[in-house]
């Protein structure tokens, strides 16, 4: 993709089918919903991960904020062109592996990833590379999905129901 100076609005429409596997580390943080994540949120998450792991593990960031978001100055009337670029976002689809960790124990990695996930505007899950397709989701998230459009979409997708294709 070309990095234009100003983009049109970017909408997240589907599930992630490419960046849904843990490729570099042993553990990963997966997005359970779609959202736009800013560069500041990615940096805050990275800092939390490195502080939690201290000097033991290594962190990979799998998302990059490449889409500019524009805004007009305060108290400026409409018209006169598109506003200036205010910040950059990374579009994240459900199922995207956002961060990966290696070199730390299972317990430390899980705790670090779930604690760092609180810095992001999406619900996150923990993926273990050795347990293919296994995701630790909190019960509150699963309960919140029941009867929603997202739950129906998950049920419609045959491969997505057992989470083999989406999160392996």
Per-segment meaning from a language model:
Residues 1-168:
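Ribosome-associated RNA-binding proteins
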